[in-house]
Amino acid sequence: MTKKYFGTDGIRGRVGEFPITPDFMLKLGWAAGMAFRSMGACRILVGKDTRISGYMFESALEAGLSAAGADVMLLGPMPTPAIAYLTRTFHAEAGIVISASHNPHDDNGIKFFSGQGTKLPDEIELMIEELLDAPMTVVESSKLGKVSRINDASGRYIEFCKSSVPSSTNFAGLKIVVDCAHGATYKVAPSVFKELGADVTVLSAQPNGLNINDNCGSTHMEQLQAAVLAEHADLGIAFDGDGDRVLMVDHTGAIVDGDDLLFIIARDLHERNKLQGGVVGTLMSNLGLELALADLGIPFVRANVGDRYVIAELLERNWQVGGENSGHVVCFQHTTTGDAIIAALQVLLSLRRREESLAQARQALRKCPQVLLNVRFAGGENPIEHPAVKEACERVTLAMAGRGRVLLRKSGTEPLVRVMVEGDDETQVRGHAEDLAKLVTEVCA
């Protein structure tokens, strides 16, 4: 059954435009409260990133949940994976995150976690959607939900992150720069690394509600690259606005993406005989990652793009490690979802164990040239299905003679068509990608 409101990563859009409006959030809170309360006593955690609209939507959700008879525990600004963790540890029925992840401040969204800290099953999302289309009724006064605030949420999550590494871990002597994207990690991330002994320079940790992801964080790496070089740091770590993506910069200023991080983590677990099964990537994962893992004897499979698909594949195979080149990295041995701080800690641990720099660690993964271009798509006929586009993709695939890949897909979170071409000749790859992007642009017009 097709969902009306929920996309691949919850509900997301422009603030003030349906469905990202206060009245919809009120109804969504009520519908979610009714759905979860139908399963028994109901307590729901609500957290958010640092967008100014988060206050407005937090109040609306709080009112709707209470009207349905659900008790609410407010966490304030917290990373998305922290809300998943706290939902489990407080034995709540669900967790709600108010965030649009790596998008600018004028977007916002909602995503849910189950009581186990995992993505909601489709059947519960469909139940919520069905209730959204029903008349809103308020429970009698004696059954209204109560609202409280958890004041030590940050401290609890900081201790959890530190517990993901051995108690003897000490990063003394390691000089790092951390870019918090003026987002949800602005308090907890610097504390985690400092308390583990690292010398930390902090960037973009002064959120004002409007500057989240604004030329900073994992989608704008230039500031971090410059700071790593200026500070003569060993490496830099960049988070996105809600703390579920991480990218790094080595001491030379080179960007280390999700494929690199996934390889470093998987290789470390494999060498210590602690890798359960293989590794899950996505259709966008670089071919070089697949080949490098194969050289180590590590199985690799591709899921659809989106962390929920990576997680679903991991669960189906009972594997532990997966991720996307955008920086979503899942380590099931520690978490139930992608957690940027946890992933960064596992990389730092690997570097310490092998006594190598981040630049040295990434050299073992030889990537194929890959070009990704985005084409604005406002809706209407799917350009990927257009005969001319299909024919062009087939022509490019033939031209690369089995030495590359072509992938066109619609973004699940933004109005974009993503054009990816990968092969062993960078000039050829870029030319093919630009030609395909131009054709898709013409078709969209």
Swiss-Prot record:
<dbReference type="InterPro" id="IPR005845">
    <property type="entry name" value="A-D-PHexomutase_a/b/a-II"/>
</dbReference>
<dbReference type="InterPro" id="IPR005841">
    <property type="entry name" value="Alpha-D-phosphohexomutase_SF"/>
</dbReference>
<dbReference type="Pfam" id="PF00408">
    <property type="entry name" value="PGM_PMM_IV"/>
</dbReference>
<dbReference type="GO" id="GO:0009252">
    <property type="term" value="P:peptidoglycan biosynthetic process"/>
</dbReference>
<dbReference type="InterPro" id="IPR006352">
    <property type="entry name" value="GlmM_bact"/>
</dbReference>
<dbReference type="InterPro" id="IPR005843">
    <property type="entry name" value="A-D-PHexomutase_C"/>
</dbReference>
<dbReference type="InterPro" id="IPR016066">
    <property type="entry name" value="A-D-PHexomutase_CS"/>
</dbReference>
<keyword id="KW-0597">Phosphoprotein</keyword>
<dbReference type="Pfam" id="PF02878">
    <property type="entry name" value="PGM_PMM_I"/>
</dbReference>
<dbReference type="InterPro" id="IPR036900">
    <property type="entry name" value="A-D-PHexomutase_C_sf"/>
</dbReference>
<dbReference type="InterPro" id="IPR005844">
    <property type="entry name" value="A-D-PHexomutase_a/b/a-I"/>
</dbReference>
<feature type="binding site">
    <location>
        <position position="244"/>
    </location>
    <ligand>
        <name>Mg(2+)</name>
    </ligand>
</feature>
<dbReference type="Pfam" id="PF02879">
    <property type="entry name" value="PGM_PMM_II"/>
</dbReference>
<dbReference type="InterPro" id="IPR005846">
    <property type="entry name" value="A-D-PHexomutase_a/b/a-III"/>
</dbReference>
<feature type="modified residue" description="Phosphoserine">
    <location>
        <position position="101"/>
    </location>
</feature>
<feature type="binding site" description="via phosphate group">
    <location>
        <position position="101"/>
    </location>
    <ligand>
        <name>Mg(2+)</name>
    </ligand>
</feature>
<comment type="similarity">
    <text>Belongs to the phosphohexose mutase family.</text>
</comment>
<dbReference type="Pfam" id="PF02880">
    <property type="entry name" value="PGM_PMM_III"/>
</dbReference>
<protein>
    <recommendedName>
        <fullName>Phosphoglucosamine mutase</fullName>
        <ecNumber>5.4.2.10</ecNumber>
    </recommendedName>
</protein>
<dbReference type="GO" id="GO:0000287">
    <property type="term" value="F:magnesium ion binding"/>
</dbReference>
<keyword id="KW-0413">Isomerase</keyword>
<dbReference type="GO" id="GO:0006048">
    <property type="term" value="P:UDP-N-acetylglucosamine biosynthetic process"/>
</dbReference>
<keyword id="KW-0460">Magnesium</keyword>
<dbReference type="InterPro" id="IPR050060">
    <property type="entry name" value="Phosphoglucosamine_mutase"/>
</dbReference>
<dbReference type="GO" id="GO:0005829">
    <property type="term" value="C:cytosol"/>
</dbReference>
<comment type="function">
    <text>Catalyzes the conversion of glucosamine-6-phosphate to glucosamine-1-phosphate.</text>
</comment>
<feature type="binding site">
    <location>
        <position position="240"/>
    </location>
    <ligand>
        <name>Mg(2+)</name>
    </ligand>
</feature>
<dbReference type="GO" id="GO:0008966">
    <property type="term" value="F:phosphoglucosamine mutase activity"/>
</dbReference>
<dbReference type="GO" id="GO:0005975">
    <property type="term" value="P:carbohydrate metabolic process"/>
</dbReference>
<feature type="active site" description="Phosphoserine intermediate">
    <location>
        <position position="101"/>
    </location>
</feature>
<dbReference type="GO" id="GO:0004615">
    <property type="term" value="F:phosphomannomutase activity"/>
</dbReference>
<feature type="binding site">
    <location>
        <position position="242"/>
    </location>
    <ligand>
        <name>Mg(2+)</name>
    </ligand>
</feature>
<dbReference type="InterPro" id="IPR016055">
    <property type="entry name" value="A-D-PHexomutase_a/b/a-I/II/III"/>
</dbReference>
<keyword id="KW-0479">Metal-binding</keyword>
